[in-house]
Curated annotation (Swiss-Prot):
Function: Mediates both basal and acquired thermotolerance.
Cystine residue pairs: none
Broad class of the protein's primary localization: cytoplasm
Originating organism: Arabidopsis thaliana (Mouse-ear cress)
UniProt family annotation: Belongs to the heat induced plant HTT protein family.
Keywords, comma-separated and alphabetical: Cytoplasm, Nucleus
Lineage summary: Eukaryota, Viridiplantae, Streptophyta, Embryophyta, Tracheophyta
Name listed for the protein in its UniProt record: Protein HEAT-INDUCED TAS1 TARGET 4
Inducers of expression: Target of TAS1 (trans-acting siRNA precursor 1)-derived small interfering RNAs in response to temperature variations. Up-regulated by cold (at 4 degrees Celsius), but rapid drop of expression after a temperature shift to room temperature (at 22 degrees Celsius). Highly up-regulated in seedlings exposed to heat shock.
Gene Ontology cellular component annotations, sorted alphabetically: cytoplasm; nucleus
Tissue occurrence: Expressed in seedlings, leaves, stems, inflorescences and siliques.
Length: 280
């Protein structure tokens, strides 16, 4: 029965219940925890491929991290009978969670959870392992995972999170594998970057600071005389690779007198981290 469940989930991977589509359409352009989870699983997938722990690039479930963040295992409350993959349990789950309209879905759950960081997600993966992406609900699913989801196989992930502050330190890590970072976003520069180089803040009254976004740095290369990082970013619900200048530094991000918006001299990419996996 468990094998049939996995086969069914693989066949419908990426498909959404209408409630999920509606929730996604209503969601803001940026969901910090979902983005952190997505960066974390991409870092793990890349590291496992480089270390030859996976024969090919294997996608793991970011939604698994969303579903399990903040949850503590309590053996005393485990209902072994409901945790089994049976026809009865599947029908019970559908009746209680899918066929019955819920007024307070994932959005209410999200409001009760702290915002996840990439480090949080990596540490959770080290603790619980990760299922393959196609074996779990899609990222942003509005339905809670069924009790019998504990039967879905997980790949064990062991290691530690390495954090560094400067790009010089980060570059040493990047030699071995992609790394996570946060990117200062300015609009409309990020909207208009296209195939060019994102250089952040430029002169002009139209510029405004969007905030920090979790990204994955894939590599560093030279482009038109500038050192640039090739960065994978989710912006306005779309994944893309952009070139980010490594030479740009700036002092402030606002001209309206709000001191809370002023920051110390910095590059566009900050707060670097990487999962250092154990192969034992």
């Amino acid at each position: 029965m468990a094998e049939r469940l996995l086969q069914s989930m693989s066949r419908v991977a990426g498909r959404c219940h209408p409630d999920c589509v509606k929730a996604s359409d209503e969601q803001e352009d940026y969901h910090a925890s979902q983005n952190a989870a997505l960066v974390a699983v991409n870092l793990i997938s890349s590291a496992r491929l480089i270390l030859k722990l996976d024969a090919e690039f294997t996608e793991y479930s970011a939604q698994f991290l969303m579903d399990n963040a903040g949850k503590e295992d309590d053996p005393g409350e485990v209902d072994q009978q409901r945790n089994q993959v049976t026809t009865e349990n599947c029908l019970r789950y559908l009746a209680e969670n899918v066929w019955t309209k819920k007024e307070n879905g994932q959005g209410g759950m999200d409001q009760q959870r702290p915002v996840l960081t990439v480090k949080d997600c990596l540490e959770l993966a080290f603790k619980k392992g990760l299922p393959r992406r196609e074996h779990w609900a899609h990222l942003g699913c509005t339905f809670k995972a069924p009790p019998f989801a504990c039967q879905i196989p997980r790949v064990p992930v062991k290691g530690e999170v390495v954090e560094v502050k400067t790009f010089d330190e980060a570059f040493k890590l990047l030699v071995h594998q992609p790394i996570g970072a946060k990117l200062h976003l300015f609009s409309p520069q990020i909207d208009n970057v296209g195939e060019g180089v994102y250089k952040g803040l430029t002169t002009g009254n139209e510029t405004h600071y969007v905030g920090l976004r979790d990204v994955l740095i894939a590599s560093v290369e030279e482009f038109e005389g500038d050192s640039v990082a090739i960065v994978k970013i989710c912006y306005k619900k779309k994944l893309s690779f952009i070139k980010v200048s490594l030479s740009v530094r700036f002092l402030s991000v606002a001209h309206d007198g709000d001191k809370s918006k002023f920051i110390a001299p910095t590059g566009l990419l900050v707060d670097f981290c990487v999962p250092r996996l154990s192969i034992n």
